Design a protein with these regions (language model features):
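Ribosome-associated RNA-binding proteins
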Residues: 1-140
Length: 140
């Protein structure tokens, strides 16, 4: 991570993020750096976990993990399978109609959950009636 005006140092087992500028934009970026560092330290100590729920009414959705991808079969009775990429660093556990995503990188786990949710987006139909999909139900 690099940004003009922000210095990152490690002194005596402490991470120091500092700036000499008084500008709001640089202070905002300083806070962003600090937040990312805290998330990284927390992720190493305790993994981030997202819980997802498979919801369907008529056509049972079937899930399989296939070579780094989540294969979603029989979504709304479709013949073609839908896929969502599962990057390295994210562990996925499928049990019945629940999916648990875990990993040390908060952004990566959250992005993966979002990709899975978007892979089952209903298009061209009334979403009040067709509520099938895979949804995020918990974050930890």
């Amino acid at each position: 991570m690099r940004y003009p005006g922000i210095e990152i140092k490690i002194e005596e087992k402490e991470l120091i993020i500092s700036t000499e500028s008084q500008r709001k934009k640089i202070y905002a970026m300083l806070g962003t750096y600090a937040s990312h560092a805290k998330n990284m330290f927390r992720g190493v100590n305790e993994e981030y976990e997202y819980g997802m729920k498979v919801v369907y009414s008529h056509f049972p959705i079937q899930l399989k993990e296939v070579s780094g991808k989540l294969e979603i079969v029989n979504f709304l009775g479709e013949k073609e399978a839908r896929y969502a990429a599962i990057p390295e660093g994210v562990k996925m556990k499928i049990s019945g109609d629940e999916i648990k995503l875990t990993g040390i990188d908060k952004e990566l786990v959250g992005t993966t959950a979002s990709r899975i949710e978007k892979a089952t987006k209903v298009r061209g139909r009334d979403t009040r009636v067709f509520q099938d999909g895979i949804y995020i139900v918990s974050k930890a």
